Swiss-Prot record:
Component of the ribosome-associated complex (RAC), a heterodimeric chaperone complex involved in regulation of accurate translation termination and in folding or maintaining nascent polypeptides in a folding-competent state. RAC stimulates the ATPase activity of the ribosome-associated pool of Hsp70-type chaperones SSB1/SSB2 that bind to the nascent polypeptide chain. SSZ1 is required for ZUO1 to function efficiently as a J-protein for SSB1/SSB2. Also involved in pleiotropic drug resistance by post-translational activation of transcription factor PDR1. Residues 464-484 are annotated as: Disordered. Keywords: ATP-binding, Cytoplasm, Nucleotide-binding, Phosphoprotein. One of its GO terms (cellular component) is cytoplasm. This is Ribosome-associated complex subunit SSZ1. It is found in: Cytoplasm.
Length: 538
């Protein structure tokens, strides 16, 4: 059996592994503890090493030997890293100019680990889990990275993987991997603009991606390194701490172990409220010997964390603006990351974005119900795509001249019977490209006008229906005219005429648009019955 190429998503908070099984389907691999979203954490007790969920459990009793939130430190000098991200676990120290950790291994022995070594150990655990599941050695992987990862960080990741016998054959950016996995399961029926919003544990990332003929083009990216699921945990911690303090006059924030207990249980409560309308929290001896038992419903949780949810929505708005697009230019928002399970995230985006924008999250039947597995699945699909390439062929296929293709700045399309513009090739379509459309109703002499198009957003104010003069007097004190409604609509207009083609006595027409690698446009119109064709070039 040949060694499969696996897909790995390595996040600050959690990691996932996937591969293409013998039936040619994507399998997301669970570790020996049954975790598919495997916490990116390592913990040490004496000579024993714990990984994943077992390591996270050590945060309460053994925080100084538990390493968390370390992914973003790879390949960066110590002074460029925000080491406060791992403050709840082992404190970061400078080791050889890099982020490192000093771990107690018992009997007075200490071990200094650079972040490179920590990454190697984490990837090795993922590799072993994959080998155990697949039943054969794993030597190669496609690894996802954020769009803002530097070449130095990628090089360091490759080196850490190579140390444990794992070759990174390709990096794929996280939003493209997630969108690839979504489109494999739920194909887009037309060209679309999609925001991929990844809300993780300690950071949020987003990208606006134009999907044209199956090709992805990133139009803009955004990153907020201080916004994530931990912000929701913090709001719950503060709420529960205040309630506990009111009841017992004891402050659980003052004791590190009490605070760690509260954080761990708040995170569990947050996850429970993603699937249920209420949750209970129960902590033995939270502070000053007092036990804490309480319940919270989803509505209260959403009110407590309302400001954070508003920040998530604003973050999506910001990346759309960065792409110099209007929300009406967006067809869908694909939610990924652990926060995506939270229903309030979806409802907020549905409220702030136009109705035409589909929110593709776990609550949508047209989207994956496991958004935190999308990127790993996409990496596995990319691994399948490149598995037949050798190293030289893959390097050739990834040359900038091939990957960085030119794109249309304006849409190209046809003029309708009433002088309206119908786009065929949308803006941001990469070329070379070919697109066909069939007009079966075209009869007789037929003139085809090919134009560039422009689009704009038109706003109309709809005045409310005024109150009737003879309205019931009882209603008068409570009734008032509604506010005017502003309706926004995306409209196309004709731009520059590119060419005209005429067909006589047509009986249905097929029109083929071709743009070559140099940007030359050829349009062919063919009579469906006779096969006669006319061509125009520009």
């Amino acid at each position: 059996m040949s060694s499969p190429v696996i897909g790995i998503t390595f996040g600050n908070t959690s990691s996932s592994i996937a591969y293409i099984n013998p039936k040619n389907d994507v399998d997301v691999i669970a570790n020996p503890d049954g975790e598919r979203a495997i916490p990116s954490a390592l913990s040490y007790v004496g000579e024993d090493e714990y990984h994943g969920g077992q390591a996270l459990q050590q945060l309460i009793r053994n925080p100084k030997n538990t390493i968390i939130n370390f992914r973003d430190f790879i390949g960066l000098p110590f002074d460029k890293c925000d080491v406060s991200k791992c403050a709840n676990g082992a404190p970061a120290v400078e080791v050889d100019g890099k982020v490192g950790f000093v771990i107690s291994r018992g009997e007075g022995k200490e071990e200094k680990l650079t972040v490179d070594e920590v990454v190697s150990r984490h990837l090795n655990r993922l590799k072993l889990a994959a080998e155990d599941y697949i039943g054969s050695a794993v030597k190669e992987a496609v690894l996802t990275v954020p769009t803002n990862f530097s070449e130095e960080q990628k090089t360091a990741l490759k080196a850490s993987a190579a140390k444990i016998g794992l070759q990174i054959v390709q990096f794929i950016n996280e939003p493209s991997a997630a969108l690839l996995a979504h489109a494999e399961q739920f194909p887009f029926e037309k060209d679309v603009n999609v925001v991929v919003a990844d809300f993780g544990g300690i950071r949020s990332d987003a990208a606006v991606i134009a999907v044209r003929n199956g090709i992805f083009t990133i139009l803009a990216t955004a990153h907020d390194l201080s916004l994530g699921g931990d912000n929701l945990d913090t709001e719950l911690v503060e709420y529960f701490a205040s309630e506990f303090q009111k009841k017992y006059q004891a402050n659980p924030r003052k004791n590190a172990r009490s605070l760690a207990k509260l954080k761990a249980n708040s995170s569990i409560t947050k996850k429970t409220l993603s699937n249920a309308t209420s949750a209970t929290i129960s902590i033995d001896s939270l502070a000053d010997g007092f036990d804490y038992h309480a319940s919270i419903n989803r509505m209260r949780y959403e009110l407590v964390a309302n400001k954070v949810f508003a920040q998530f929505s604003s973050f999506v708005d910001s990346v759309i603006a960065k792409a110099e697009l209007d929300p009406l230019d967006i067809d869908a928002v694909l939610l990924t990351g652990g926060v995506s399970f939270t229903p309030k995230l979806t409802t907020n985006l549905e409220y702030t974005l136009p109705e035409s924008v589909e929110i593709l999250g776990p609550q949508n039947k047209n989207a994956s119900n496991n958004p935190n597995e999308l990127a790993a699945s996409g990496a596995a699909l990319q691994a399948r795509l490149i598995s037949d390439y050798d190293a030289d062929e893959l390097a050739e296929a990834l040359q900038p001249v091939i990957v960085n293709t030119p794109h249309l700045k304006k849409p190209i399309g046809l003029i309708g019977a009433k002088g309206e513009f119908h786009p065929v090739l949308l803006a941001e379509t990469s070329f070379p490209v070919q697109k066909k459309l069939t007009l079966k109703q075209a009869k007789g002499d037929f003139l085809i006008g090919v134009y560039e198009g422009d689009h704009h957003i038109e706003e109309k104010t709809l005045e409310p229906i005024p109150k009737e003069e003879n309205a019931e007097e009882d209603d008068e004190s409570e009734w008032s005219d509604d506010e005017p409604e502003v309706v926004r609509e995306k409209l196309y207009t004709l731009g520059t005429k590119l060419m005209e083609l005429g067909i006589k006595n047509a009986n249905g027409v097929e029109i083929i648009f071709n743009i070559n690698k140099d940007g030359a446009l050829r349009v062919t119109a063919r009579d469906l019955k006779t096969g006669n064709a006319v061509k125009g070039e520009l």
